[in-house]
Amino acid sequence: MRLILLGPPGAGKGTQAGLLTKKHGIPQLSTGDMLRAAVAQQSEIGKRAKAVMDAGQLVSDEIVNQIVSERIDAPDCANGFILDGYPRTVPQAQALGTMLAGKGLKLDAVIELKVDENALVKRMESRVAETIAKGGQVRSDDNPEAFRKRLVEYREKTSPLSSYYAGTGELRVINGMAPVEEVTAEIERILVPA
């Protein structure tokens, strides 16, 4: 199972990826985690990424694509993977398609969790209140203003992926506002048709 989960921040991608990972025994591949691992391993590509990050710049698509390609080759990805936070742009999606084809692989599905942005802000505010009530640490970007900025960035940079994958026939859209169990069941129906 090779899968991409799309949706704005707070849509539940991480929750669904965790459930699918547990059920199917496939890894969730996060670009942030992959970049940190490459830097820690001091691989050639990791050293290049570190130099860019140390300069306070965004890591180029070329470097990110190479790190993703190397990670997909790892033994734990033999039965599939869930991509989290990649691709973020249409050029990255095109590079991923070319990369997978070169490995004799293809995506099984691109699943977009459709959500109402105003409801997402309320969901985030509830999560913050719950975390504070439990005495937990709140993420610095978990405030309405920062969250809305992340939503705008998603809309501008990442949402064009929906049109791209709709054009390839790989996109499946799910109501991300449904309860977690219903979203999971719908994803399973897409991945394992009756």
From Swiss-Prot:
GO CC, alphabetical: cytoplasm
GO terms, molecular function: adenylate kinase activity; ATP binding
Span list, region NMP: 30-59
Keyword hit for ATP-binding: yes
Catalytic activity field: AMP + ATP = 2 ADP
Binding site for ATP: G10, A11, G12, K13, G14, T15, R127, A178
Organism: Brucella anthropi (strain ATCC 49188 / DSM 6882 / CCUG 24695 / JCM 21032 / LMG 3331 / NBRC 15819 / NCTC 12168 / Alc 37) (Ochrobactrum anthropi)
UniProt binding sites for AMP: T31, R36, Q57, L58, V59, G85, Y86, P87, R88, Q92, R139, R150
Record-linked PANTHER family: NUCLEOTIDE KINASE
Cross-referenced NCBIfam families: adk, PRK00279.1-3, PRK14527.1, PRK14528.1, PRK14531.1, PRK14532.1
PROSITE patterns: ADENYLATE_KINASE
Protein name listed in UniProt: Adenylate kinase
Function: Catalyzes the reversible transfer of the terminal phosphate group between ATP and AMP. Plays an important role in cellular energy homeostasis and in adenine nucleotide metabolism.
Entry similarity comment: Belongs to the adenylate kinase family.
Protein's cellular compartments: Cytoplasm
Domain notes: Consists of three domains, a large central CORE domain and two small peripheral domains, NMPbind and LID, which undergo movements during catalysis. The LID domain closes over the site of phosphoryl transfer upon ATP binding. Assembling and dissambling the active center during each catalytic cycle provides an effective means to prevent ATP hydrolysis.
Keyword Magnesium in annotation: no
Region LID: start-end pairs: 126-142
Protein origin, superkingdom: Bacteria
InterPro entries, A to Z: Adenyl_kin_sub, Adenylat/UMP-CMP_kin, Adenylat_kinase_CS, P-loop_NTPase
